[in-house]
Structures are given as C-alpha cells and as structure tokens.
Amino acid sequence: MNPRPRKLKVLRWVPNRWVLTRGARRERVLHLTFDDGPHPEHTPALLDLLAAHGAKATFFLIGREAERYPDVVERIVREGHVLGNHSWSHPQFDRLDLAAQREEIQRTDRLLTRFDGAARHDFRPPRGVLPRPMVLDCVRRGQRIAYWSYDSLDYSKRPAEILIASAQRYPPEPGEILLMHDDSALSLQLLQTMLPAWAAGGFVFEPLRPSA
C-alpha cells in the first residue's frame, strides 16, 4: 500500500505552477485535502476534528453537492479552510470533449465564488484523470491543477486500522499534499489517530496557498 501515486514520476517534470504536486519541502507543513464533498454528516464531523487540532485544509468540492448543501460550504469558509474545484458532477473526464470539461470546471467556479469571493479556484480532476487537452486548456486560462503526493487510500474501503497502519509505515514528508475524501467516515477515523501523531512530530496543517 504505497501512498505515493505512480503519476508523480511524470508529473514531477511539470512546473508546479501548472500542476501542483507538493508544497515546500523545507517547511514542516502537511497539506490536508478532501475530495467529493460536501457531505451533510461526514464533512461537519471532519470540521469538528480539524478545529479541535487547529488544522486548516483544502476541500475540493463537487459543484452539485455544494449547491445541495450550502450551509456546509459556508461553514468550511467561515472556519478558515480553502475551497477547491472538483468539477460539477464528477464525470469520467477522459470521456468528455474539451468544451464539456471546461463547463464542468467553470460552472463549479461560478458557484464557489458565491461562497468565498475568489474568481478562480485550484482544480482537481475527478479520479486524478489528466487529459492533455484539458491540462493545456487550464494552463492557457491560468487555472492551476492541484494533484497530490500522498494517497490515504481511504476510497479503497479498507478498514481504518489498515489505513492507519499504512500511514504509520509510510509517514508523510514535509510539504506533502495528502489526498482524502469527506464522503465517508474513513478519513475521520484515520485522522483521529494520525492528526495527533503528526502534530507530535512537529507538523502543522495548512491549506494549499492559492495560485497567483
């Protein structure tokens, strides 16, 4: 259960201003990121845990779910976390043409702007799929793609004990961007153990810094 995605072998050659794969290695910071929310039960529970540890994160939201649960999105922003774009409907991006991909992204940005006032948000493609035309289109429009360097594997539906054991065996390094999901309880169960452990190791938890 190696937490580092294979795509990093290729993505490390792509400028970070186009596809962000990790933060600064010199800082003892971890970047917690959560995909597929907001969820009416799991996201608030996760926000409670983050608040208890003074941790800030980035939430890559599905547009239609953000529209469905605006109160949860408002709380995310109010508590100092950062919103990211995870498409409108979480489709299989490599099955869409470029115009449809762009609409998935821009429709979500328009909605998120109503919550945080930001004109543009970091985009994380569903399932990490990176069609080349989409990447080039994002570069042309100045929209950064945010990938990850450390995969919690919480979507694998393995028991939390196995995910915790993997996180302990393969500890994250400074600047890592951690991939998690807030559409189930697994990330919460993982972080209930690992947040205190990482904090005890001197880590602080910050959202991804917005692109220029």
What residue spans do the PLM features occupy?
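Active-site beta->alpha N-cap acidic-glycine motif
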Residues: 2-96, 100, 104, 111, ...
